[in-house]
Amino acid sequence: MKRTFQPSKLVRARRHGYRARMATKNGQKIVARRRAKGRKRLTA
């Protein structure tokens, strides 16, 4: 059985990147929450 995590920078950016987050209302809420919390990295 293969491992479930097969790293890919492109897929990671497309699924969890800044533009992917900002594309939806809920994604914008995630970024806003992380900003309020003071996270150094907002998205992947």
From Swiss-Prot:
Sorted UniProt keywords: Ribonucleoprotein, Ribosomal protein
Biological process, per Gene Ontology: translation
Matching InterPro entries: Ribosomal_bL34 (IPR000271)
UniProt GO MF annotations: structural constituent of ribosome
Cellular-component GO terms for this entry: ribonucleoprotein complex; ribosome
PANTHER family linked: LARGE RIBOSOMAL SUBUNIT PROTEIN BL34M (PTHR14503:SF4), MITOCHONDRIAL RIBOSOMAL PROTEIN 34 FAMILY MEMBER (PTHR14503)
Family stated for the protein in its record: Belongs to the bacterial ribosomal protein bL34 family.
HAMAP family, per database record: Ribosomal_bL34 (MF_00391)
Protein name as catalogued: Large ribosomal subunit protein bL34
Species this protein is from: Caulobacter sp. (strain K31)
